[in-house]
C-alpha cells in the first residue's frame, strides 16, 4: 500500500487523517510542520504528501522550497488549505504541488477518495489540478 506523509499543524485534523488513512491500509507518518516533515523524509519515502500551507516553524511553501520536488518527481503533493485561488496556492503549484484541497470542502471521512484519486486509484472532487 502507498506511503503517505501528513504535514498538518491542527492536531485534531492530523490525528483524524492519520487514523482514517491507516484504517484503509496506508503506511502513514504524520508531523506538525515543515521542519518536522523534512526530518521525517530522512527515513520515510512517501508516495504522497498531504501538506498544510500555513503552519508554525516552517509553512508549506518553505517546505516545498527546501524539499525541491523537481528532485522527487515520483512524490505527489496535495496542498491542504482554506485559501482557494490564493497567491500562496499558485506559488505551491509553481513549486510542484499537484492539487489544492480546500479543507472546509473535504470532510475527513472523504479523505480516502481524495488520496485514491491522487494516487490514480479513483476519482474525487478537488479545487485544482496542475
What are these regions (language model features)?
Residues 39, 61-73:
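Short amphipathic alpha-helix used as the core "switch/output" element in two-component signaling
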Residues 11-29:
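Two-component/phosphorelay signaling modules centered on CheY-like receiver
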Residues 55:
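Receiver (REC) domain active-site loop signature in two-component systems and cognate sites
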Residues 30-39, 59-60:
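Helix N-cap/capping motif at the beta->alpha junctions
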Residues 8:
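Conserved acidic carboxylate
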